[in-house]
């Protein structure tokens, strides 16, 4: 939801020295929680789902230029489990949704978005990956008060680029992100249309299935509450259940030294610096100038 952001954010002024260092590696004590156990009959459904995808690919081959990226995506050991969980075991729905995403990825090519293409969207820090929650989920901050561009396809590509980098940062055993949306400084003049917000919500829910672990919506004024009320019918129940609004203390879920000190319980005195942030993230994720990675995608 990067395009929810606007200029002129006034953040809490915390005393003491600040740091531009970005936390891109989970602390030793952060451990992924146990994965949901399979239910009776799920193994057979998973095999059928995988075969359905293979049969589809045999009839609709991937373009050669994108084939290696599709193979990496399909090789994720829990890919099929995520789709089955997202549909609560509905095999027919799982088949439809995974093929929808396969075709979307062939068209959008999220793994190979060049950094320079989306760098202008990153200059004000409206999306920041920094820190990990107690279960080693990467934390993605979305700050509407730092919007610096007009609504465009590039904004959506930057949202997807940020999600892909969050996935790259996940340690083994972790499949989800924690998202913190900070509406501090947001005003009505820069709010997106409901249609635009729905489009992004569709991408997140449809093509990044079961990637949201937790979400916190902070510093939310009343007019944003009305916006969420209008958007709510377009959010699936699973997504809505993971969102917490104006949480008074986030340290139940995120260690204070991993949480930006702009938020309840946070103690990490982070100061955004575009050059430092961009260089650190691109290098940590192994992103090359053409958008490809030096290491296999997580």
Cite the ranges covered by each PLM segment:
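Basic, amphipathic alpha-helical/coil surface patches used to engage anionic, phosphate-bearing ligands
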Residues: 1-298
């Amino acid at each position: 939801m990067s395009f929810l952001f606007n200029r002129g954010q006034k953040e809490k002024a915390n005393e003491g020295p600040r740091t531009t260092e970005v936390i891109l590696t989970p602390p030793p004590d952060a451990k992924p929680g146990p994965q949901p156990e399979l239910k009776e009959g799920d193994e057979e459904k998973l095999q059928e789902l995988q075969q359905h995808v293979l049969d589809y690919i045999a009839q609709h081959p991937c373009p050669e230029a994108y084939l290696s990226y599709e193979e990496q995506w399909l090789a994720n050991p829990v890919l099929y489990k995520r789709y089955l969980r997202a549909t609560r075991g509905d095999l027919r729905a799982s088949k439809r949704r995974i093929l929808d995403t396969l075709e979307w990825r062939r068209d959008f090519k999220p793994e190979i978005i060049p950094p320079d293409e989306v760098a202008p969207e990153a200059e004000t820090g409206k999306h920041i990956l920094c820190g990990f929650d107690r279960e080693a989920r990467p934390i993605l901050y979305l700050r509407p008060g730092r919007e610096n561009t007009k609504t465009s396809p590039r904004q959506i590509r930057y949202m997807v680029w940020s999600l892909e980098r969050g996935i790259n940062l996940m340690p083994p055993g972790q499949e989800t992100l924690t998202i913190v949306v900070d509406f501090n400084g947001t005003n009505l003049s820069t709010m997106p249309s409901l249609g635009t917000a729905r489009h992004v919500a569709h991408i997140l829910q449809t093509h990044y299935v079961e990637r949201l672990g937790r979400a916190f919506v902070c510093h939310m004024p009343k007019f944003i509450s009305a916006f969420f009320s209008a958007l709510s019918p377009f959010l699936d129940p699973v997504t809505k259940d993971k969102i917490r609004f104006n949480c008074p203390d986030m340290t139940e879920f995120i260690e204070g030294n991993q949480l930006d000190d702009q938020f309840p319980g946070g103690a990490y005195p982070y100061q955004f610096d575009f050059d430092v942030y961009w260089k650190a993230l691109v290098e940590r994720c192994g992103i090359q100038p053409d958008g490809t990675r030096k290491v296999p995608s997580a």
